[in-house]
Structure formats: C-alpha cells, structure tokens
C-alpha cells in the first residue's frame, strides 16, 4: 500500500508542477500583450510631440553625396517607354517609364576584349510609374533630359482568311 500511496503523492506533485507551469505561462502572456499595447501608446504619443523642419529654398546636396562633379552636372538622361518585345504578343514591359543615362567614354579591355567604362551610372536603368516622376527626378539631380513620347501601335485589321489567300504572297510553298 505504501507504493500505491507513494505513486498518488507523486501524481499530486506532478499535477501541482503542471498547474504552476501553466499559470506561469498564462501570466507571462498577459504582460507581453500589455507591453505591446503600452509600447504602441508610447510610440503614438511620441509622434504627436515631434515637429517637422521645413525648408523653403532648394538645397544643394551634392557635397554630401560624394559623387564626383562630372557625374552630376554634365549628365544627360533619356526618358522613354520601352518598345514591346517583337518575339511575344504581350505588352508587359510597356507600362512603366524608364530613365537611362548617356554613354560616356568606353574602351576595350586589352586582356579579355570586354568593353570597359569608368562611369558607374552608364549601365543603370531607373524605372518610374509616370513620366512626371521621371522628369522631377532628373530635375532634382540637375540632369538635362530628353523625353521620348509613348508610341502606340495601330492595330491592323485583317481577317483570318487573309492568311490563306491565293493571290497574296503570304503562302509559303512546302516544296
């Protein structure tokens, strides 16, 4: 009987440990929720106290960027919408405006024969959702720009039967 009472006391001790562990876990969960709420309230209160600094005149930030002067003042960019891919019928890449930089000095690498350049911006293409955004970006950086208008293709209306016409040179002989 002593072994049975021992196991009962062990069971009771284990149940107490589980209850304490469950209570500790539930107690830990409540403060974390309160901590998140109080942190959010603290952050919300801080945004009300801050004030924005506004500057009326346009500031020149070129000394702060570290970009050489020749890459800023003498730069010309081309703003355009890319043409549709001729190999596919989709118009996926014709919705956004692209800005590409002019080609500066290039030379052929004598070892490998690759085209080399010292211009870090020559191979970079920027993408914009609107033409006005691209123009504003170019003006902000002091670049001169050329805008090429969007070319909308005119659909040619022809019937399916025109593909099999006998009097046109659309049919290809198989022999």
From Swiss-Prot:
InterPro entries in alphabetical order: NADH_UbQ_FeS_4_mit-like (IPR006885), NDUFS4-like_sf (IPR038532)
Coiled-coil regions listed in the entry: none
Subcellular location: Mitochondrion inner membrane
Gene Ontology cellular-component terms listed: mitochondrial inner membrane; mitochondrion; respiratory chain complex I
Span of the transit peptide along the chain: 1-42
Main location: mitochondrion
Annotated Pfam families: NDUS4
Single GO molecular function: NADH dehydrogenase (ubiquinone) activity
Keyword vocabulary terms for this entry: Electron transport, Membrane, Mitochondrion, Mitochondrion inner membrane, Phosphoprotein, Respiratory chain, Transit peptide, Transport
Region Disordered, annotated ranges: 152-175
Protein topology in the membrane: Peripheral membrane protein
GO biological process, one term: sensory perception of sound
Family of this protein: Belongs to the complex I NDUFS4 subunit family.
Known role: Accessory subunit of the mitochondrial membrane respiratory chain NADH dehydrogenase (Complex I), that is believed not to be involved in catalysis. Complex I functions in the transfer of electrons from NADH to the respiratory chain. The immediate electron acceptor for the enzyme is believed to be ubiquinone.
Assembly with partners or alone: Mammalian complex I is composed of 45 different subunits. This is a component of the iron-sulfur (IP) fragment of the enzyme. Interacts with BCAP31 and TOMM40; the interaction mediates its translocation to the mitochondria; the interaction with BCAP31 is direct.
Protein name as it appears in the record: NADH dehydrogenase [ubiquinone] iron-sulfur protein 4, mitochondrial
The organism of origin for this protein: Rattus norvegicus
The organism's taxonomic lineage, starting at the top: Eukaryota, Metazoa, Chordata, Craniata, Vertebrata
Gene expressing this chain: Ndufs4
